A protein has these predicted regions:
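Hydrophobic transmembrane alpha-helices and their immediate loop junctions
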Residues: 1-156
Length: 156
């Protein structure tokens, strides 16, 4: 099921009104390539897609994982990052490189709902309970975001 959130419609309106159609089209293409990486592994491992949501913050594929295989889960959650990395290696455009590099960096941050959180969660679930993992990742994610904010203010 495809869901289009109101925030996505609002985002499209801003894109059309702002005059940044080219830049935001590149961003949207980067997001599509990222999600295609997830989709590739979801279909490869025959997992069930519950929905695809278009929001003002991106696209989210909600999948019902029926596998306990850690490698398969890591490939599904890391598939977006892999597709961005492959795209960087194939396409040598500086603009494209920057968008994909940022997408990779942001998705490696271990905060919900990003890929970094999902991958670390899969790895830690082999050793710890979900509640402990969520608590640890909450504090780690908060620390990382705080450091990013501080660095962005210091090194403008």
């Amino acid at each position: 099921m495809i869901k289009i959130k109101m925030s996505f419609v609002f985002f499209l309106g801003i894109v059309l009104y702002s005059g940044l159609l080219n830049e935001l089209s590149n961003l949207f293409l980067t997001i599509l390539i990222h999600e295609a990486g997830h989709l590739f592994f979801i279909l490869l491992f025959k997992q069930k897609i519950k929905s695809v949501e278009f929001t003002g913050f991106g696209i989210f594929i909600n999948v019902s994982l029926s596998t306990n295989n850690i490698l398969k889960k890591l490939l599904i959650f890391g598939g977006g990052i892999l597709s961005n990395l492959i795209f960087i290696l194939i396409i040598k455009s500086r603009i494209t490189y920057d968008y994909h590099k940022i997408m990779i960096f942001l998705n490696l941050i271990p905060i919900i709902p990003l890929d970094g959180f999902q991958m670390v969660n899969v790895l830690l679930s082999c050793f710890y309970e979900d509640e402990f993992i969520n608590d640890v990742l909450f504090y780690v994610g908060t620390l990382i975001l705080s450091l990013l904010l501080i660095f962005s203010l210091i090194f403008k």
